[in-house]
Design a protein with these regions (language model features):
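Extended alpha-helical targeting/anchoring segments
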Residues: 1-299
Length: 299
């Protein structure tokens, strides 16, 4: 099928799940009390093709009468259209309400953590690592409002909104971690970003700067090598190849430097084996992966 999904699970897998899988001991309390993993299987999917302006209904093992199911879908679409027409869909209007953002690092502590990470690189423990921080946001806006704003103001190829009642997940990312079609596995790591220019000349200059950046190419090369190693653990011998290297991808607000690694999944392996081998992705950890994760947890 050319549809993005016809069956299967939807959900999220947290970084902490990957940390525990790699036996990296937690050295700090959790910032948020939430499950490490939630995957849900759904009977039905409504799929919207934005380019073709078509809707598809996919039903799996549905015992309900088909006509009744179609009526339910038509009613849902009609109600949604009415809300949209009346301006009642969340996130469709500009919201300039104030927000408060609180990081879990002070500026000085974060700078020190980055310096400590640089010291580990100089000492040869790691080649590259991803030092992030946790931001707590206080706002009157709902998570769905935030998702809609992200889709409108900074559209990304991959994103989602998951509502689990007391817990909502909002995601937006330009990066494809893993894809598998007909047994072929692909990962497309990103390392290297430049903002879009305000003019055509500025745009071309920023793109050229990224194309010629040895620093960004070196970072991406390290992650490509890591991803090749991860895929080789579950793919057929000799099948793992770098199919694309140092490509520039253009988005609404930025340029990204991207590569792609592909392999054919071994006959005795499945998607769970693939996730076990590759998660978390190298672009959000560093290389070597295990040591980078240990240092991230320390700092």
């Amino acid at each position: 099928s050319d549809l993005p999904i016809v069956s299967g699970a939807m959900g999220y897998i947290s970084y902490d799940y990957g940390r525990e899988k790699e036996n990296v001991a937690a050295r700090h309390p959790k910032e948020v009390d939430m499950p490490d993993l939630i995957l849900c299987f759904y009977d039905n999917f409504i799929i919207e093709d934005h380019q073709e302006k078509r809707f598809y209904l996919v039903a799996n093992g549905q015992t309900k009468e088909v006509d009744t199911l179609l009526d339910d879908v038509e009613n849902t679409v009609a109600e949604t259209y009415t809300l949209w027409k009346n301006g009642q869909i969340p996130g469709t209007k500009d919201d300039h309400s104030k927000i408060r953002v609180t990081p879990n690092f002070t500026k000085e502590d974060y700078k020190q953590a980055v310096q400590d990470m640089i010291d580990y690189i100089v000492e040869g423990d790691i080649y590259i690592a991803n030092m992030t921080q946790h931001l707590t946001v206080e706002s009157t806006r709902t998570p769905y409002d935030v998702f809609c704003s992200l889709r409108r103001d900074n559209p990304s190829p991959f994103g989602g909104y998951l509502n689990y009642g007391d817990l909502q997940i909002v995601s937006a990312s330009p990066e494809r971690f893993l894809q598998m079609r007909d047994g072929v596995v692909a990962t497309r790591p990103i390392k290297g970003t430049r903002k879009r220019g305000a003019t055509r000349e500025e745009d071309a200059a920023m793109r050229k700067e990224l194309e010629e950046s040895d620093k960004d190419k070196s970072e991406l090369l390290m992650i490509v090598d890591l991803e090749r190693n991860d895929l080789n653990r579950v793919c057929m011998p000799g099948s793992v190849k770098v199919t694309e290297m140092y490509s520039i991808e253009t988005y609404a607000t930025v340029f990204h430097l991207v590569s792609e690694v592909q392999g054919r999944l071994a006959e005795d392996k499945n998607v769970v084996d693939l996730l076990e081998a590759a998660f978390p992705g190298g672009s959000i950890t560093g290389a070597p992966k295990l040591r980078a994760m240990e240092i991230i947890e320390e700092l």
